[in-house]
Curated annotation (Swiss-Prot):
Pathway note: Cofactor biosynthesis; coenzyme A biosynthesis; CoA from (R)-pantothenate: step 4/5
InterPro entries in the cross-refs: Cyt_trans-like, PPAT, Rossmann-like_a/b/a_fold
Keyword Protein transport among record annotations: no
Subunit record text: Homohexamer.
Site keyed Transition state stabilizer: positions: H19
Name listed for the protein in its UniProt record: Phosphopantetheine adenylyltransferase
């Protein structure tokens, strides 16, 4: 039987508990999952590519069938080049669906052999986004409940803060 590989792409700046939830769900559905961290030249990221990849590896270290790689360019080409047959995308809201539905159609036109699989996060993670985590953290708020402990530590360090006692 063939092994089924899925790719979960994103910027992961930083990886959140919502991302981790989706990766773990995908790992139950697919034999292998690649967390594809975008090089993202078009975005100003808080964390470097190496930092984002290391945080993802640390957060998902307990998932042996998950690997973390970087990619540049079209994620469909990255997926096809690795023999992937599915891309995993998370949906938190109807707004996410509208955008992701259009993107899935374009991706299917570009690489017909790669399907888009939509997963919804567990209810406690539906409102979490990397953007909000960065904004709350930058403004001095506590984001410990939205990211794993290792990511939280790195975020505090990056923002020049220390953990509350």
């Amino acid at each position: 039987m063939a092994h089924v590989l899925a790719v979960y792409p994103g910027t992961f700046d930083p990886i959140t508990l919502g991302h981790e939830d989706l990766v773990r769900r995908a790992a139950r559905l697919f034999d292998r999952v690649i967390v594809a961290v975008a090089i993202a030249h078009h975005k100003k990221t808080l964390f470097s590519l190496d930092e984002r990849m290391e945080m993802a590896r640390q957060a998902l270290a307990d998932c042996p069938q998950v690997q973390v790689e970087s990619f540049e360019g079209l994620v469909t080409e990255f997926t096809a080049a690795r023999g992937g047959t599915a891309m995993v995308r998370g949906l938190r809201s109807g707004t996410d669906f509208d955008y992701e539905f259009q993107l899935a159609g374009m991706n299917r036109a570009l690489v017909p052999g790669v399907e888009t699989v939509f997963l919804t996060p567990a209810s406690q993670y539906q409102f979490i986004s990397s953007t909000l985590v960065r904004e709350i953290g930058t403004l001095g708020g506590d984001v410990a409940q939205f990211v794993s402990p290792g990511v939280h530590e790195r975020l505090l360090h990056k923002l020049g803060r220390t953990a509350a006692a």
